């Protein structure tokens, strides 16, 4: 295993199905001058709450891009629901959020002030995807958020429903069938 599972294999885990892609979304105030990962240097950036997937992803992205949290003016830990207000009140320059799209938090930020979605691209990102197979290249659709008309490249993962291998097959089948028979309600 890797990360918190390092040295402790989890042979009893089984994936039932993938649900939706979750993308790393890096949102900056338009006036912050952030157009790329390198532009985060010297900025106040919310990296995600401690222990979150967003925080782990951003720390890995920064490391791969040759940046440390010390290179930022501030590495913030603002609650998700407070991110749009903090960004628009200029208490931070950018925030990261791993999420599916469309997302109401991101819509609040885009409607509260002039924002841009920062592309997560470049040689460092290529190396990250090559060395961490659970990340993939993806994009945030254009037209979903105010001010973002074209797709924005980034990386992401897939949300997967995982169960114990001890779960009886008929129960696993029942869960899968219930979700897919009622997929519109499941969303």
Predicted feature descriptions by range:
Residues 181-187:
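Periplasmic-binding protein-like
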């Amino acid at each position: 295993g890797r990360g918190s599972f390092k040295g402790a294999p989890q042979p009893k885990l089984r994936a039932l199905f993938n649900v939706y892609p979750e993308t790393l979304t890096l949102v900056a105030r338009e006036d912050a001058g952030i157009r790329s990962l390198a532009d985060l240097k010297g900025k106040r950036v919310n990296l995600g709450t401690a222990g979150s997937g967003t925080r782990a992803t951003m720390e890995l992205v920064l490391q791969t891009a040759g940046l440390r949290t010390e290179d930022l003016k501030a590495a913030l830990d603002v609650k998700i629901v407070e991110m749009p207000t903090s960004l628009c009140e200029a208490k931070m320059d950018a925030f990261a959020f791993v999420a599916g799209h469309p997302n109401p938090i991101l819509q609040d930020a885009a409607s509260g002030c002039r924002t841009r979605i920062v592309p997560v691209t470049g040689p460092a990102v290529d190396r990250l995807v090559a060395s961490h197979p659970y990340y993939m290249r993806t994009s945030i659709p254009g037209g979903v958020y105010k001010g973002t008309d074209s797709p924005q490249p980034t990386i992401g993962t897939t949300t997967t429903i995982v169960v114990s291998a001890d779960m009886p097959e008929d129960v696993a089948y029942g869960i899968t069938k219930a979700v897919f028979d009622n997929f519109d309600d499941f969303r």
